[in-house]
Amino acid sequence: MGGTISMRRSRSTGDLRQRLLRARGETYERLLGEVEDGSSQSLGELDKGLSSLSCEGQKYNQEQYMNTPWRNPAEEREKLAYRKQNMDDIDEEDDDLVGDTVRPKVPLRTMSYKLAIDMSHFIKEKGGLEGIYYSARRHRILDIYLEKEEGIIPDWQDYTSGPGIRYPKTFGWLWKLVPVNVSDEAQEDEEHYLMHPAQTSQWDDPWGEVPAWKFDPTLAYTYEAYVRYPEEFGSKSGLSEEEVRRRLTARGLLNMADKKETR
């Protein structure tokens, strides 16, 4: 039985890479997490357990967090029930992204630290994401794939906002987004496009960068997103509201959010 499951996973993961490579591009959307959501939260909602944490030089492990330091088990159960109730409402277009129905083959569950690590290594072993350019559509394909094959509720995939390396906000997910240099010739070359279709360009990215997935095993030991950019976690960071806004403003993220709201 184990061999059968392994063979099925191997085939399906190989299909994932091909579907990601074939995915048509879309304008870069803010699937990286809306910074205004974090910055607008009241400090009164701050978890007391986080108030004593320092965000400098700390390492995190699965004993400290379920996955991220603000997961609420009751809320997660509600999400799980909601997903089960609304599974039939998923768009047909989403079905096409993975080439099959997105009805999960296993019971639905939330992403955990251990599960994120297991899925990261499994996808790496099958060559799933390495070097593939990030796009909103590919983000969605990965969500649907793990929902269908592993029953993982697609609320886990989120990255820091950039510029530069975008670190996963889900502790245990070992794939970060790294800006790569793509020459004009490579972007215009038909063969390169077919082999590595850069479905997101520097014109789609708010920072003018072309991010690609890269495996980083050290993310299993250090919660880089939280250590480097605590302000992106809003009131959950332990920072004062003023400090959160100051840091977001210094990085140009609040201005970016304001421009989006006025469009």
From Swiss-Prot:
InterPro entries given in the database record: HIV-1_Nef_core_sf, HIV_Nef
SUPFAM superfamilies for the chain: Regulatory factor Nef
Record keyword Lipoprotein present: yes
Tree of life domain: Viruses
Keyword Transport: no
Listed Pfam families: F-protein (PF00469)
Keywords: Host cell membrane, Host membrane, Host-virus interaction, Lipoprotein, Membrane, Myristate, Viral immunoevasion, Virulence
A GO term from the CC aspect: host cell plasma membrane
Covalent lipidation (N-myristoyl glycine), chain numbering: 2
Listed GO MF terms: GTP binding
Localization: Host cell membrane
Region (Acidic): 88-96
Membrane topology: Lipid-anchor
Mediates dimerization: region residues: 140-156
Role this protein plays: Seems to play a role in optimizing the host cell environment for viral replication without causing cell death by apoptosis. Enhances virus infectivity and pathogenicity. Probably involved in viral immune evasion mechanisms. In infected CD4(+) T-lymphocytes, down-regulates cell surface expression of CD4, CD28, CD3, and MHC-I or MHC-II molecules.
Assembly mode: Homodimer. Interacts with host CD247/TCRZ; this interaction induces down-regulation of cell surface TCR/CD3 complexes.
Note: This is a macaque isolate.
Domain notes for this protein: The N-terminal domain is composed of the N-myristoyl glycine and of a cluster of positively charged amino acids. It is required for inner plasma membrane targeting of Nef.
Family membership: Belongs to the lentivirus primate group Nef protein family.
Protein's name in the database: Protein Nef
Organism expressing this protein natively: Simian immunodeficiency virus (isolate 1A11) (SIV-mac)
Gene responsible for this protein: nef
